[in-house]
């Protein structure tokens, strides 16, 4: 607020707009000054323009949120109407996530990073595609490598650019020394036989495993993909494509400010750290 006051003094603006909601001031720990904001709203020299209509919050959620807001001791009384939809509010058990989240789009909000981690581990076991803090858990390059190797295994030709990606997820037990980076043209097309004969792909792995017969999860073994193989296979077993749009997102309450989905799950669990 000192910076805002200084800018006003120096620039001499005709009007300054300050937007906020004292009921959602969850960043006090990061410097949010709720008392100063409320004082500005009560200053008769300032004009307050309340936004009285929500276009996102349904009635059932609005009732609960309003009841909780009444317990805030220092707040601005305000009119805030829900959208014209009853909505639905459920109390769900964290444990049977596989039943609760089987259908629809979900935003899972957690109080701590540790709880986010636990939820993600559960989603991994169930084989569901999801985003964590807004980013897909499946790297696009990993998807490209899996699809490209599967095509090679079927006898199809693949571009050198895609083969370069495949090679980036293999170690020296799959590729001969000196061929860690694909040396061919990125625009040319190659078969798996081309790679074995001219570009360092080993014909056999471990002495008796014929490379051409191996699935992607046996061939792609670099560190970046190895720890995700079990999860990726679980996703595919569940009938999903790796490049499907994730319908589940996991985040802390703080990090998801402004996020929305058809269904929102709020986990009130606390890990040991915050106590």
Language model features: what each stretch is:
Residues 1-85, 107-125, 133-141, 244-249, ...:
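Conserved helicase motor core of SF1/SF2 NTP-dependent helicases
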Residues 30, 66, 87-94, 149:
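Alpha-helix boundary/capping detector
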Residues 81, 98-100, 240-241:
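Short secondary-structure boundary/capping segments
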Residues 91-104:
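Conserved interdomain hinge at the start of the Helicase C-terminal
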Residues 110-275:
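Core RecA-like ATPase module of SF1/SF2 helicases and allied nucleic-acid translocases
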């Amino acid at each position: 607020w000192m910076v805002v006051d200084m800018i006003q003094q120096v620039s001499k603006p005709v009007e300054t707009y300050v937007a906020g909601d004292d009921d959602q001031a969850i960043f006090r720990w990061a410097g949010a000054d709720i008392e100063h904001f409320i004082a500005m709203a009560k200053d008769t020299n300032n004009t307050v323009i309340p936004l009285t209509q929500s276009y996102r919050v349904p009635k059932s959620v609005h009732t609960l949120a309003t009841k909780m807001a009444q317990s805030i001791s220092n707040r601005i009384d305000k009119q805030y109407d829900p959208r014209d939809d009853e909505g639905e509010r459920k109390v769900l058990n964290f444990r049977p996530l596989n039943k609760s989240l089987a259908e629809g789009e979900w935003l899972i909000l957690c109080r701590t990073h540790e709880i986010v981690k636990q939820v993600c581990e559960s989603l991994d076991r169930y084989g569901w595609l999801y985003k964590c803090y807004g980013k897909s858990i499946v790297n696009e390059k990993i998807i490209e490598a899996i699809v490209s190797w599967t095509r090679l295994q079927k006898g199809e030709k693949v571009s050198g650019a895609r083969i370069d990606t495949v090679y980036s997820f293999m170690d020296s037990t799959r590729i001969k020394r000196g061929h860690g980076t694909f040396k061919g043209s990125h625009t040319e097309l190659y078969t798996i036989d081309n790679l074995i004969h001219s570009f360092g792909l080993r014909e056999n792995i471990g002495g008796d495993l014929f490379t051409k017969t191996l699935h992607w999860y046996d061939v792609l073994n670099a560190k970046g993909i190895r720890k995700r193989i079990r999860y990726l296979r679980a996703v595919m077993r569940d009938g999903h494509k790796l490049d499907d749009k994730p319908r589940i997102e996991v985040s802390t309450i703080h990090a998801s400010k402004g996020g929305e989905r058809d269904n929102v799950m709020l986990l009130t669990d606390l890990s040991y750290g915050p106590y």
